[in-house]
Every structure is written in structure tokens, then in C-alpha cells.
């Protein structure tokens, strides 16, 4: 009788966790590297996630990793990313997606435009959601660089917003800053996330401005505009405001440098954040 009761108790807990979502076994997690990087650069991070949060981790890369992350436009990388995920049957019931830097923009692109295998929690580490700009002039909005350099896809010159909206091939599309054939589905898919977590750092020496990691960016005078004051948020172009109002959009901050977010030195800070969602 005792053995029977034990069996029934275990069976009930199993059914409860699967039917009501009170998960006893974590869903899988996908990790995606950033620019000028590859899956091997995320090995320490992926192993730490797997052991710390009892989740099976798939540490993936696009193309050959390093070269593809630099020289392939993000529109092409996104197509390959979606195909790579759809090849993995273990992800078909849903997964958490952690994207590092540029990888966070691709992870968000997957959640918005693909998502046949649904993203549950979308987590981005120091990802330039607001774009990047640096102290030199170049032809970022030329068709050549848009087609041959990934960073051009999220280059945002605050003094040339018309060019950004017209010529930039990736970020204004996934931000719903311009109306496209995928605008409605992107907003629907973002609103379907259980949680959208952005992690940024004032000590991020690579992303300019660092606040881009939380959807903020410069105005024409190079003053940082808080996310709540952006058109993207105020007009809820993408569904971020909807998530925030329902306590499903979360901004967290570390004091790590950009690359440290994938290294053990930053793990204690990341643990305190990620334990809330994984």
C-alpha cells in the first residue's frame, strides 16, 4: 500500500507539473553567441547555465561562427538561425533563449518572425536593442555594407534617422519602427512571451551607448533617451509597453564589462537575475 501511494504521489506531481506548468524539470535553453565570436566562446557560460539551473543547453552558432557573425547580414543570419532551431526536435515544446550581444538581436528576431518552436523566456545580455553609433563616419547605410557587414544592420545615427529607417535592413524592422509585412506578427509574438529580460551594464565599453542594452538611445544632441520616452515604448510599436504593464518585461543591470557577461567573473551577478526566470 505504501509503495502504491508513493507511486500515485509521484505520478500526480508529474502530471501536475506538465499540465499546470509548475515545472519540476526545466525546459531546454538555447544560447547564442555575439559578433566576432562562436559557440566555443560561450562554452563556459553554457556549462554554467546547465549545471546551475538544471536545464539542457544547446549552445548554437550560425554558419562558421566567427566570420559569419561579422560578414553576413543579420537578415541572412536570422534565416539560418530559424532553420537551425527547427532542426532540433527537442525544442519543439518550447525553450528559453539567451542571446549575447548581437546574438540577442537575432534571438529576438527569431521570437518575433519565426517562433514555430516557441520562446518562453527571452533573455538578452548587453544586446544593442536601440542600435549602436561610434565616433567615426562611414557608409553604414550603403547597400554594400548592409549586405556584407552585420553591424550595419543595427547602426543608428541619431542625426540621420531618415536614412536609418529607410536603409537599415534589420533593427528598424524588428523594432517595428517602420511598417512592414511582418509588423503585426512580430508584435503578437513579443506579447506572447512569458518574460522578456534585458540585462545591460554601464561598464559596457563596446556598445555605444551602453543603455542601448535596455532599448534606450541618443537623441540628436547625443543625450540618452530613456526607454519610457521613446516612440517605440510610448506608442507600443512592438508590445514592450504591454509586457511591462503586465510585469513581463524586465530590465536588470550588472557592473560587468561587455565580454565578462559570458565569463565566470560575472556569473554571481547573473545568477541572482537568472534564478528569477530559469
Question: Which residues fall in each region the model found?
Answer:
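Short hydrophobic segments within beta-strands
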Residues: 30-35, 98, 199-201
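N-terminal signal peptide
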Residues: 10-28
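Serine-dependent carboxylesterase/thioesterase catalytic core
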Residues: 33, 75-166
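Surface-exposed acidic, glycine-flexible loop patches that form ligand/cofactor-binding
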Residues: 20-22, 86-91, 114, 181-190, ...
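Short, surface-exposed "cap/lid" segments of acyl-processing enzymes
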Residues: 23-55, 59-63
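Helical cap/lid subdomain of alpha/beta-hydrolase-fold lipid enzymes
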Residues: 121-278
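Classical eukaryotic N-terminal signal peptides for Sec-dependent ER targeting/secretion
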Residues: 1-10
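Catalytic nucleophile-loop/oxyanion-hole region of alpha/beta-hydrolase
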Residues: 66-78
Amino acid at each position: 500500500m505504501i509503495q502504491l501511494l508513493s507511486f500515485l504521489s509521484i505520478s500526480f506531481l508529474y502530471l501536475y507539473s506538465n499540465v499546470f506548468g509548475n515545472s519540476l524539470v526545466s525546459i531546454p535553453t538555447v544560447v547564442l553567441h555575439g559578433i566576432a565570436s562562436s559557440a566555443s566562446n560561450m562554452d563556459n557560460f553554457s556549462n554554467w547555465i546547465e549545471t546551475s539551473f538544471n536545464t539542457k543547453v544547446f549552445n548554437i552558432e550560425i554558419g562558421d561562427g566567427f566570420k559569419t557573425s561579422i560578414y553576413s547580414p543579420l537578415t541572412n543570419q536570422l534565416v539560418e538561425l530559424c532553420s537551425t532551431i527547427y532542426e532540433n526536435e527537442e525544442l519543439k515544446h518550447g525553450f528559453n533563449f539567451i542571446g549575447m550581444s548581437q546574438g540577442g538581436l537575432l534571438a529576438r528576431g527569431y521570437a518575433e518572425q519565426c517562433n514555430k518552436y516557441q520562446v518562453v523566456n527571452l533573455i538578452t545580455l548587453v544586446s544593442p536593442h536601440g542600435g549602436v553609433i561610434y565616433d567615426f563616419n562611414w557608409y553604414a547605410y550603403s547597400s554594400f555594407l548592409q549586405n556584407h557587414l552585420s553591424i550595419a544592420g543595427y547602426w543608428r545615427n541619431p542625426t540621420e534617422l531618415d536614412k536609418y529607417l529607410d536603409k537599415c535592413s534589420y533593427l528598424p524592422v524588428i523594432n517595428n519602427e517602420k511598417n512592414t509585412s511582418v509588423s503585426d506578427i512580430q508584435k503578437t509574438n513579443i506579447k506572447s512571451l512569458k518574460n522578456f529580460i534585458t540585462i545591460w551594464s554601464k561598464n559596457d565599453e563596446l556598445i555605444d551607448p551602453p543603455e542601448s542594452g535596455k532599448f534606450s538611445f541618443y537623441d540628436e544632441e547625443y543625450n540618452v533617451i530613456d526607454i519610457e520616452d521613446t516612440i517605440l515604448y510610448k506608442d507600443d510599436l512592438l508590445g514592450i509597453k504591454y509586457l511591462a504593464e503586465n510585469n513581463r518585461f524586465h530590465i536588470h543591470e550588472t557592473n560587468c564589462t561587455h565580454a565578462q557577461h559570458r565569463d565566470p567573473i560575472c556569473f554571481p551577478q547573473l545568477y541572482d537575475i537568472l534564478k528569477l526566470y530559469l
